[in-house]
A protein has these predicted regions:
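Active-site-proximal beta-strand elements of phosphoester/diester hydrolases
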Residues: 222-226
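Cytosolic ligand/metal-binding cores
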Residues: 119
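Hydrophobic helical h-region of N-terminal Sec-dependent signal peptides
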Residues: 6-10
Length: 251
């Protein structure tokens, strides 16, 4: 976390000095796991949540990651019924992450949404969310249980280019025969899927677990409901998502 604090404090220096071919990744709200996931000598990490004027950092972004966190305020997707089902809100963060998504989308910046970040990806694109999964779709699959749980997800898309942005797949691929065991810690999820968002994988209750934006619209916008940053540094999904993200950033 030390590097993030330094970069936040010295933002004026970053904007005025040559970055020496380093690339800048903006995290919507940083934590140690996210920093460790993407930390490299040629990467500058900025914690947007600790910047008072986020407009001042947008043009620095070579990549943007929306991280996990609180529930998104339901009025952002025109839902008043969900308010009573939600936990805590962070209105400033809602606005910040909507702005970061819009900037990434409009400027073709490589983008990852994790957990809440994938939900914001859908909401910002015009989709909606389930307010509380056990209440609305049942508890056949536990998505959290006093903390993080593990469960299987199944790849449901057959476009190998889309799938490989997130999952480590090689050679001949058969949809609905590819399973991954992932971590889970959420009580909300994607309901109405926004236009241009393609579901790549689902849990057994049909909840979207991985998505991409149509590559005809944006070259690299991906989202996952699970937490790749906490899967372990040698986990194939942890590595694949990071490497594909870096490939786009360093093109």
């Amino acid at each position: 976390m030390k590097n993030i604090l330094v970069y936040s404090i010295l933002l004026l220096s970053i904007t005025s000095c040559n970055k020496n071919n380093k690339k800048t990744i903006i995290l919507s709200k940083a934590s140690e796991n996210y920093v460790n996931w993407i930390d490299r000598r040629d990467i500058i990490i900025i914690d947007a949540y600790n910047i008072s004027n986020t407009d001042s950092i947008l043009n620095l972004a070579d990549g943007i990651i929306l991280t996990g966190g609180e529930d998104i305020f339901p009025l952002m997707y025109n839902d008043t019924n969900n308010i009573k089902l939600c936990g805590e809100f962070d209105f400033r963060r809602d606005t910040l992450e909507k702005n970061l998504f819009d900037y990434a989308f409009n400027n073709k910046i490589p983008f990852i949404g994790v957990c809440r970040g994938m939900q914001m990806m859908n909401v910002a694109s015009g989709g909606t969310l389930y307010g509380d999964l056990p209440t609305e779709i049942g508890d056949s699959i536990l998505h959290r249980n006093n903390g993080e749980v593990m469960h299987d997800i199944i790849v449901t898309n057959n476009n190998i280019d889309n799938i490989s942005m997130i999952f480590p797949v090689n050679g001949k691929f058969s949809p609905k025969k590819y399973f991954f065991n992932v971590n889970s810690w959420h009580h909300q999820g994607l309901k109405l899927i926004a236009e241009d968002i393609i579901v790549i994988a689902e849990s057994y209750d049909g909840l979207p677990e991985a998505v991409v934006i149509n590559t005809n619209v944006h070259p690299f916008m991906i989202g996952v409901q699970f937490h790749p940053e906490r899967l372990g540094k040698y986990h194939p999904i942890h590595l694949n998502m990071r490497d594909k993200f870096f490939e786009q950033i360093f093109k």
